[in-house]
From Swiss-Prot:
GO terms for biological process: defense response. Disulfide bonds join C5-C20, C9-C22, C14-C27. This is Cyclotide mech-1. It holds the Pfam family Cyclotide. Probably participates in a plant defense mechanism (Potential). Binds to and induces leakage in phospholipd membranes, particularly ones containing 1-palmitoyl-2-oleophosphatidylethanolamine (POPE). Not active against Gram-negative bacterium E.coli ATCC 25922 or Gram-positive bacterium S.aureus ATCC 25923 up to a concentration of 64 uM.
Length: 30
């Protein structure tokens, strides 16, 4: 929830679902 993963989840979910979660249309790690 703090560190950006460099992914966006506007149209598709986060690619790295195990480490990253979607928040505010951006994927964050933890």
């Amino acid at each position: 929830g703090v560190i950006p993963c460099g992914e966006s989840c506007v149209f598709i979910p986060c690619i790295n679902k195990k480490k990253c979660s979607c928040k505010n249309k951006v994927c964050y790690r933890d």
